[in-house]
Design a protein with these regions (language model features):
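Acidic, low-complexity intrinsically disordered segments
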Residues: 1-156
Length: 156
């Protein structure tokens, strides 16, 4: 799971001299989805580009790469998707607010796009039971059943 750095955010966190400043809250969704995958027995690592360097060479062996997009980070997410397609065998999944608003755009870069809240479909998508190019996830019926983010998978 990678949350790409964006060129612009409304109240942007930033890096200066190797240290991150400000608050980033865009990683919560990926940490929830990663926690679901981890609980099901998958090896999961999450990275937020803004908080440090992502070891892309290390990720060359990944089977699946999930990219989370805000509108401000979509160009970077698409750049990363192209890199993973060119340099790895990984399937690339794209989700997040921007992908939910413009799924056809995201589908040009991803093997699959998750539209909406992915908690109910992420496991089936990753394990190949859902193969649609654009996956429309249903709205959660009971918010109390959504797990807490698993910060243990965050590597940066």
């Amino acid at each position: 799971m990678i949350t790409p750095a964006s060129a612009l955010r409304r109240f942007p966190p930033y890096r200066l001299a190797g240290k991150a400043y400000g608050q980033s809250n865009s990683i919560t969704g990926p940490l929830i989805l990663g926690g679901i995958l981890k609980k099901a027995g998958h090896e999961v690592e999450a990275y937020e580009e803004l908080n440090g360097s992502v070891p892309y060479k290390h990720l060359k062996d990944a089977d699946v790469v999930c990219l989370y997009t805000l509108t401000c980070s979509a160009p970077r997410a698409y750049e990363l998707a192209e890199w993973f397609h060119a340099n790895t065998h990984a399937r690339v999944l794209i989700g997040g607010i921007h992908a939910s608003a413009l799924p056809e755009e995201a589908a040009r870069y991803a093997d699959q796009v998750i539209v909406g809240e992915g908690e109910s479909v992420i496991l089936d998508v990753v394990e190949g039971r859902i193969t649609d190019k654009i996956v429309n996830a249903p709205c959660p019926e009971d918010l109390d059943r959504i797990p807490f983010p698993d910060y243990s998978i965050l590597k940066t």
